[in-house]
Amino acid sequence: MRRPVVMGNWKLNGSKAMVTDLLNGLNAELEGVEGVDVVVAPPAMYLDLAERLIKEGGNKLILGAQNTDTHNSGAYTGDMSPAMLKDFGASHIIIGHSERRDYHKESDEFVAKKFAFLKENGLTPVFCIGETEAQNEAGETEAVCARQINAVIDAYGVEALNGAIIAYEPIWAIGTGKAATADDAQRIHASIRALIAAKDAAVAEQVIIQYGGSVKPENAASYFAQPDIDGALVGGASLDAKGFAAIAKAAAEAKKA
């Protein structure tokens, strides 16, 4: 059985006090919780503080990050390299998020390049895919997701997905309070796994596929009850220790062997 992964994307939120309170709270809430990997991705300038607090808390959490560059050094003002992220203990790196694709005009091909560079540097890509509301209403969800995934497969082979995480996030559900139903999310997750299985069944069977988009303690269990939903990429709800821990506990409970 695939081990669920629940990841908190803090986006552009945080302060020293907030990071300290949130991670101390999570360390307490997750005491004794097993069967789930819990990852947090704070803003880059708080990675050092987060790494120290995670260690002090007994390493119940895994440190992640929200972005990477496609170089490890050089004249790339404002960017972060995989080598730098590793130096701070970050292992799970979000790429392809709709906010990066939209605000920073990151193409499928550029996201695929980031994906490959993370793998080359021994890090775990958390590869976000998903459709807009207009694409959803036009019945294009599966085609959009396939296009985004195939940008990686066509350039680097289906084997590149080994050890990676795919996060299906319908753009219309991110931070809106709207959410795909558990049945609808399962249908898309199953189509993603089938797309990969058509090329390599073993890769498809092991790849983690998270759902993201207004996941909350109140609805988390319904998603995790689905066979192809292997965790969640959580936004706003990850900024509350008790609520985020409840989501992680729901994943652990639902995916018990």
From Swiss-Prot:
UniProt subunit comment: Homodimer.
Protein name (database record): Triosephosphate isomerase
Reactions that this protein is recorded to catalyse: D-glyceraldehyde 3-phosphate = dihydroxyacetone phosphate
EC number(s) reported in the record: 5.3.1.1
The keyword Cytoplasm is assigned to this record: yes
Family: Belongs to the triosephosphate isomerase family.
Pfam families with a match to the protein in the record: TIM (PF00121)
Gene name of the encoded protein: tpiA
Top-rank lineage group of the source organism: Bacteria
